[in-house]
Amino acid sequence: QRLPRIGGMTGTAHEARLELGKVYGLGITRVPTHQITRRKNLGCRVFENKDEKLRVIVEDVKKLSLNGHAILIGLKSVLTSQEVASAFDKYAEDLPIEILNAVNNAEENSIVARAGQCGAVTVATNMAGRGTDIKISQSVRDTGGLHVIIAETNDFSRIDRQLIGRCARQGDPGTCIRYVALNEDVVVRFLPKILQKL
């Protein structure tokens, strides 16, 4: 209220439009992207538990990496990024991965620079979701672009969309997919009790 004019730009304002209107008295306008998106959303895979989900993620990532894709795996916290790293140690110890979280954020620029290279596997917390521009190599572009995995659903869909927005930027191709376990916290909190018993 102290500012005569306020404005901003983001790819995820639509989800927050009610809050922006109610709290700040602001409206939003959708602006079409400069280039048509080439992103392919591969949907959602659902698993009975987190252990099964992590095992399949590692198996899928190993295949994608061997085929020349660059993969970004997004998670909510340092703890879960370490759990995913442990799953790679268990099921694919020969596959090198990079971890980008608050513990090693000093290395962020160099990790991001390598994340778009052929076969790269980057495990990252939400710090990689907003504003990070992963440049992909021509060989990755030729294999379909950056592949983003939402390995842990966030409480707010806007954060997941920010992560998805790391792929298929500026006319590049890219793919995204979500992996969900029925026993992870966000599912347990929001899934109706009757469905949890199925």
Identify the role of each PLM range.
Residues Q1-I57, A102, S110-R114, T132, ...:
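A contiguous, basic/glycine-rich beta-loop/short-helix subdomain that forms a polymer-engagement track
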Residues T10, I73, V123, G165:
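Residue-level signature of catalytic and energy-coupling elements of molecular machines
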Residues G25-C44, I177-L198:
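Short, exposed interaction patches on small structured surface elements
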Residues L26-T29, I71, A120-T122, L146-V148, ...:
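Structural motif
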Residues I136-S139, G145-I149, T153-I177, L191-K197:
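Conserved SF2 helicase motif VI
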Residues R5-I6, A13-E15, H34-R38, S77-T80, ...:
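Conserved nucleotide-binding/hydrolysis micro-motifs of P-loop NTPases
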Residues K63-G68, V78-L146:
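Conserved motor-coupling elements within RecA-like helicase/translocase cores
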Residues I6-M9, V121-T125, V148-A151:
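Structural recognition of the conserved hydrophobic beta-strand(s) that form the central parallel beta-sheet
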